[in-house]
Amino acid sequence: MQGRLSSWLVKHGLIHRSLGFDYLGVETLQIKPEDWHSIAVILYVYGYNYLRSQCAYDVAPGGLLASVYHLTRIEYGINQPEEVCIKIFVSRKNPRIPSIFWVWKSADFQEQESYDMLGISYDSHPRLRRILMPENWIGWPLRKDYIAPNFYEIQDAH
């Protein structure tokens, strides 16, 4: 079943995959990394003027990484704004996604955090750097296959 936005994208020949709806009825779409920037601009022009959040996660150990964007279409006089969730999956060997900083400025620190924790590079981001971990930190702490360097678990002696 396609939602309103998915139907509009199909009508205009924009390639995507509908992943269904969440429990609140928000449609989730999968977009290819190479199509993301142009579709992001189209969504902004279409009225999705607010990036509510961006996050990333590791799908499975040794598998894909995902970058997730929650967009909202805010209009004056509308009580229930339209929302959409965009997911972009990338290989962990070369995790590159176009930055949407130039479309929604609020992506700035969110994309930096995703880079810092999972190693996803956001192409053309003006300040992509580590913001939570030290600059010399090795690895990506939120990846499921990450092994913390020099880490020893302390257990209670009960």
From Swiss-Prot:
Recorded superkingdom: Eukaryota
Gene3D superfamilies: NADH:ubiquinone oxidoreductase, 30kDa subunit (3.30.460.80)
Known EC number: 7.1.1.-
Key word Calcium present: no
GO biological process: photosynthesis, light reaction
Protein localization: Plastid, Chloroplast thylakoid membrane
UniProt membrane topology term: Peripheral membrane protein
Keywords per UniProt: Chloroplast, Membrane, NAD, NADP, Plastid, Plastoquinone, Quinone, Thylakoid, Translocase, Transport
Gene Ontology annotations for the cellular component aspect, listed alphabetically: chloroplast thylakoid membrane
Subcellular location, principal: plastid
Record field: catalytic activity: a plastoquinone + NADH + (n+1) H(+)(in) = a plastoquinol + NAD(+) + n H(+)(out); a plastoquinone + NADPH + (n+1) H(+)(in) = a plastoquinol + NADP(+) + n H(+)(out)
Molecular-function GO terms, alphabetical: NADH dehydrogenase (ubiquinone) activity; quinone binding
Task of the protein: NDH shuttles electrons from NAD(P)H:plastoquinone, via FMN and iron-sulfur (Fe-S) centers, to quinones in the photosynthetic chain and possibly in a chloroplast respiratory chain. The immediate electron acceptor for the enzyme in this species is believed to be plastoquinone. Couples the redox reaction to proton translocation, and thus conserves the redox energy in a proton gradient.
Oligomer and partners: NDH is composed of at least 16 different subunits, 5 of which are encoded in the nucleus.
Protein family (similarity comment): Belongs to the complex I 30 kDa subunit family.
NCBIfam families: PRK12494.1 (NF009141)
Name of protein: NAD(P)H-quinone oxidoreductase subunit J, chloroplastic
Gene name of the record: ndhJ
